[in-house]
Swiss-Prot record:
<dbReference type="InterPro" id="IPR014729">
    <property type="entry name" value="Rossmann-like_a/b/a_fold"/>
</dbReference>
<dbReference type="GO" id="GO:0005524">
    <property type="term" value="F:ATP binding"/>
</dbReference>
<dbReference type="InterPro" id="IPR000924">
    <property type="entry name" value="Glu/Gln-tRNA-synth"/>
</dbReference>
<keyword id="KW-0436">Ligase</keyword>
<feature type="binding site">
    <location>
        <position position="254"/>
    </location>
    <ligand>
        <name>ATP</name>
    </ligand>
</feature>
<dbReference type="GO" id="GO:0005737">
    <property type="term" value="C:cytoplasm"/>
</dbReference>
<keyword id="KW-0030">Aminoacyl-tRNA synthetase</keyword>
<dbReference type="GO" id="GO:0004818">
    <property type="term" value="F:glutamate-tRNA ligase activity"/>
</dbReference>
<dbReference type="GO" id="GO:0006424">
    <property type="term" value="P:glutamyl-tRNA aminoacylation"/>
</dbReference>
<dbReference type="InterPro" id="IPR020058">
    <property type="entry name" value="Glu/Gln-tRNA-synth_Ib_cat-dom"/>
</dbReference>
<dbReference type="GO" id="GO:0000049">
    <property type="term" value="F:tRNA binding"/>
</dbReference>
<dbReference type="InterPro" id="IPR049940">
    <property type="entry name" value="GluQ/Sye"/>
</dbReference>
<dbReference type="InterPro" id="IPR001412">
    <property type="entry name" value="aa-tRNA-synth_I_CS"/>
</dbReference>
<keyword id="KW-0963">Cytoplasm</keyword>
<protein>
    <recommendedName>
        <fullName>Glutamate--tRNA ligase 2</fullName>
        <ecNumber>6.1.1.17</ecNumber>
    </recommendedName>
</protein>
<dbReference type="Pfam" id="PF00749">
    <property type="entry name" value="tRNA-synt_1c"/>
</dbReference>
<comment type="similarity">
    <text>Belongs to the class-I aminoacyl-tRNA synthetase family. Glutamate--tRNA ligase type 1 subfamily.</text>
</comment>
Length: 458
């Protein structure tokens, strides 16, 4: 029997969530899921929830939860609501009792070794390794005997053995015959919960309208839809995006520490560059720098996500970070400049941003224009530079000052091209390349410029 998932009425304000397990640092692949959810919610005026799936007490750590919250704030997508599953055990226990009462949750007593033996025998007979539901045949006396032997049951959800269908936001029409699946264990023998049941309970309680996650959860979806319905709820819309892989085809994992968001942040990668790469790779859009998260949100479209793996090359991030800085408006940089003690306002930022590979380099350019420094003055250029210094106009200086000054220096010295510009740049900055001198001169001021042209520290 086939039955499509009942659909919710389209809400005016969608609710989406990102649900990491705090068992390690999140990487750029996790960021892809978080960003797609957050930006879809933001664009529609909806709610973005951060849910920590921390029911595995042995592996979950508070410091990882804190790091994840820090990473989302760095990306510019702080959640509207945050909660931990470990604070909601009572709700999961209530759902467990409801499923037991309706006959959908049943106790099973096999050990892992016994289950593995069953699977090996099934494979030897060319049968799929699906749980045989032997526990359903146990009598009350059988269960009492097993428990007297010290066995404690784990609890399985009895699937309907039907075809579950849904319209996936990325993959289109999907269907899974749950007869091909083992009845999933929802509660371990020690009473702790696996991922599946708490996720459904929370999505119902929080009014989640859309679940957008990696394609490795496609099969889970059919199981979860049955649990939604068994609890008397309506399943949200589902969308399963492609996963990021390295150019080699290797999948991303938490063990690749250099791709964690904290490592990328410490390496000086721009959050907006990381966001653009995470969201746009593996879509119909080119991976390019964007001016803002709002601009990136406008490019998020589930229909534009490819079904093929998304190849992510970490080496491309450096160039994307540079391009992001080159187009970053002053308003986006202002607070960071102030925090670093960098002045000069919009004039300074527009002068130097095109020469930045990392934001931290702005401090070097600020030191160059605001603090004493010695330029590079060749002995053969001293006369020329002295003439140039003598032709410096009085202040105040503006954007036209440099052009007028160069015109006068060229006329007086007869120099042109590299012979004109190169000695001036070396004397003023000590560097072969850099921002336009026309923009730097007003920031440096007449006294500093004259001093460096004279070969001094100014």
């Amino acid at each position: 029997m086939s039955r499509s998932t009942p659909s919710r009425s389209t809400p005016s304000r969608p609710v989406l969530r990102f649900a990491p397990s705090p068992t390690g640092l999140i990487h750029v692949g996790n960021a892809r899921t978080a960003l797609i959810n957050a930006l879809l919610a933001r664009r529609a005026g909806g709610t973005f929830i951060l849910r920590f799936d921390d029911t595995d007490a042995a592996r979950s750590r508070a410091e990882y939860a804190d790091a994840i919250a820090t990473d989302l704030a760095w990306l510019g997508i702080p959640p509207d609501l945050t909660f931990r599953q470990s604070d909601r055990i009572g709700e999961y226990e209530a759902a467990t009792q409801q499923l037991k009462a309706s006959g959908r949750l049943y106790p099973a007593y096999e050990s892992e070794d016994e289950l593995e033996l069953k699977r090996r025998l099934q494979r030897a007979r060319s049968l799929p390794p699906v749980y045989d539901r032997a526990a359903l045949a146990l009598t009350a006396a059988d269960r009492a005997r097993l428990e007297a032997e010290g066995r404690r049951p784990h609890w399985r959800f009895r699937l309907d053995h039907r075809v579950v269908a849904w319209d996936d936001g990325v993959r289109g029409p999907q269907q899974v015959d749950t007869a091909s699946l083992s009845d999933p264990v929802l509660v371990r023998a020690d009473g702790s919960f696996l991922y599946t049941l708490p996720s459904v309970v929370d999505d119902l309680a929080m009014g989640v309208t859309d679940v957008v996650r990696g394609e490795d959860h496609v099969t889970n979806t059919a199981v979860q839809i049955e649990i939604f319905e068994a609890l008397g709820g309506v399943a949200p819309r589902f969308a399963h995006h492609n996963l990021l892989t390295l150019p080699s085809g290797e999948g991303l994992s938490k063990r690749l520490g250099h791709l964690s968001l904290s490592a990328l942040r410490e390496a000086g990668q721009e959050a907006l560059a990381v966001a653009a790469a995470a969201v746009l790779v593996g879509t119909s859009h080119a991976v390019e720098a964007v001016e803002s998260l709002e601009a990136l949100a406008g490019m998020v479209d589930l229909a534009h996500i490819s079904r093929a793996p998304a190849r992510f090359d970490p080496d491309d991030l450096a160039q994307l970070t540079a391009r992001t800085l080159h187009m970053m408006p002053f308003e986006a940089a202002a607070s960071r400049l102030a925090a670093a003690g960098i002045g000069g306002g919009v004039a300074f930022w527009l002068a130097v941003r095109g020469n930045l590979a990392r934001f931290s380099e702005a401090a070097d350019w600020w030191a160059l224009v605001s603090q004493p420094a010695a330029g590079v003055v060749a002995e053969s250029d001293r006369t020329f530079l002295g003439e140039a210094a003598a032709l410096l106009p009085p202040e105040p200086w503006d954007g036209q000052t440099y052009a007028n000054w160069i015109k006068a220096v060229k006329a007086a010295s007869g120099q042109s091209g590299k012979a004109l510009f190169h000695p001036l740049r070396l004397a003023l900055t000590g560097l072969e390349k850099g921002p336009e001198l026309a923009a730097l001169l007003p920031l440096m001021g007449r006294e500093r410029v004259a001093g460096r042209l004279g070969g001094g520290v100014a």
